[in-house]
Amino acid sequence: MEAGHEVTVHAFDRLAEHPMSENHHGVRIMRYHLGKTPYGGTLRTYQGIRSFQRQVVRTLLHDPPALVYCHDADTLRVGVALQQQRSVPFVFDMHDLQHTWVRYQAPQSRLRAAVAGRMKRRMLNRAKHARVVVTSSGGISPTSRGFSEWLAHHGIESHVVENRPEPPFPSRPSTESVGWTVGFVGRVRDRKAIDLLIKTVDSIQPHERPTIRIAGDGVAAASVRRHLMERVEAGELEAEVTGAFAQAELPDLLAEIDVMFAMYSPLRGNILQGALPVKMFDAAAYGVPSVVNQGCLMAEVALAEGIGCPAEWNDLTSVAKALFQARSMSVRLETTADRERRRWRKALLPVLDSLQ
């Protein structure tokens, strides 16, 4: 928009709960209601996404835009279709390795491995047609690589633009409180991560245990809520669980916690391949340290910027130690969305100039 272009967002409203057409600060949002479609890696999810892709392609072929911006791999089909049929260039913004989700529930499954492999090959083949590729992480040392290095390994050049919050950030209120709270704020998709948090809290001496605070929706949200409420009713731990929240509510949620739990099961391949959890940056922006996975890029970033502590996955002693260590930290996020905006403009400038 800053370059004088009109922007329309084509969004899949999976639960059909928002207006189908809306204008948000000059950006037109078109939402597609195609029946309720669950999140996750189910057949219904795949069918819903395919239906969304076909609808968007039909819409854009009727009135082609000057540029298509593909937000993650499940929209690449749209970009390639417009390029092949109308010579419209597209940008690929990759902030996840979508194919890794297929194997998450059953990593030993040969069928899931075959499906994941096919998705990976298809994504890479389509990505090679993009005018520009933007991705959300890049290595900061030879030790742990990010998505940019993963793409380079497959012959695709990319520009790193991390997903960091927008300043200014309010000061964290200083309050006198009894006890402390560990939070998991965001999409609740990884039940294994929540189970690790619960087991770790169980392993801590009762008089030192933190309260658990969960906020967010996702495929595992309902089961997590049921399990935690059963534990609370049995008097075994203290916890509070709430569902989806608006971005405007995030500061108040972060003000409730002392440490952010940002660990994920390594069975999700993208953790070891360079994913950077947005919740780690969001928490640091409000003065909250995070506990993250050891032995990968997120640990290097957390240590380099002084915004968190790494812990070994499934090692209760290591996780508990990191929670206590993080609790005593004072953090401040120095690198924000300001830097990422400059990176994004530099990456997109050639393609935007070509549209003039």
Language model region names:
Residues K192, A246-L253, M260-F281, V292-E300:
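Nucleotide-sugar-dependent
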Residues V224-L254, V259:
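Nucleotide-activated donor-binding/catalytic signature segment of Leloir-type glycosyltransferases, i.e.
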